[in-house]
């Protein structure tokens, strides 16, 4: 048997690698959900037109979809740093949304977050396929996709918990907090780029 199949163990799935992918996917999904869950409240707090948040969220999802058409070229260009640069896009987008003095500047922020996540999502799915033998790939993908729905389900509760912990009700908090998480993920990816837990 090849080394890949040996690493996949008796269950036909490389459990350690799968868990790492699940964690990474869950964290990145949670981070970008600030755009869909918290953007309308932030815009209202800044006295922007909250009605425009629907358009901005639509552009966010459009940006998620776009990289899929060019993923091969993106990965070829970014190489082993693909996840790092994708996280950088997310961080830049969250920062722009947070500090934006003008309503229209939130649009590129949303799109940067979407583009970063739009690269990470299919990349994670692709790597998940490599963690299992062909007969187990559907099961492995199911476990990874569970993290997407868990992040959606738990995101409001996680944000509320940390807002209570830090005694703040600021509408900017979800973007600041998620930016910090993204920066930590970037540091981890950079520090471990030669032998990253989430290496390409």
Regions found by a protein language model. Name each.
Residues 67-79, 163:
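Helix-to-loop junctions at the C-terminal end of transmembrane segments
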Residues 134-167:
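A late C-terminal transmembrane helix in Major Facilitator Superfamily
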Residues 174-200:
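Multi-pass alpha-helical transporter architecture, strongest
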Residues 1-5:
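Short, small-residue-biased leader/transition segments that mark boundaries at the very start
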Residues 17-58, 64:
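Extracytoplasmic gate region of multi-pass secondary transporters
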Residues 82-96:
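Structural signature of the two symmetry-related core transmembrane helices
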Residues 119-132:
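Intracellular juxtamembrane helix-capping segments at the cytosolic ends
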Residues 159-181:
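A membrane-interface helix-boundary motif in multi-pass transporters
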């Amino acid at each position: 048997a090849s080394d890949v199949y040996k690493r996949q163990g008796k269950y036909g799935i490389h459990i350690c690698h799968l868990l790492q992918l699940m964690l990474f996917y869950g964290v990145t999904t949670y981070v970008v959900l600030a755009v869909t869950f918290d953007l309308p409240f932030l815009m209202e707090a800044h006295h922007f037109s909250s009605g425009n948040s629907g358009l901005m969220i639509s552009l966010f999802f459009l940006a998620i979809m776009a990289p899929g058409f060019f993923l091969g070229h993106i990965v070829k260009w970014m190489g082993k740093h693909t996840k790092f640069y994708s996280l950088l896009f997310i961080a830049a987008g969250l920062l722009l949304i947070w500090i934006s003095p003008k309503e229209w500047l939130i649009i590129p922020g949303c799109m940067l977050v979407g583009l970063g996540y739009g690269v990470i999502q299919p990349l994670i799915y692709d790597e998940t396929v490599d963690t299992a033998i062909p007969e187990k790939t559907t099961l492995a993908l199911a476990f990874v996709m569970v993290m997407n729905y868990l992040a959606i389900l738990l995101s409001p509760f996680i944000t509320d918990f940390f807002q209570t912990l830090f005694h703040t009700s600021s509408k900017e908090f979800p973007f600041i907090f998620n930016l910090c998480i993204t920066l930590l993920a970037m540091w981890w990816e950079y520090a471990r780029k030669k032998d990253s837990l989430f290496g390409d």
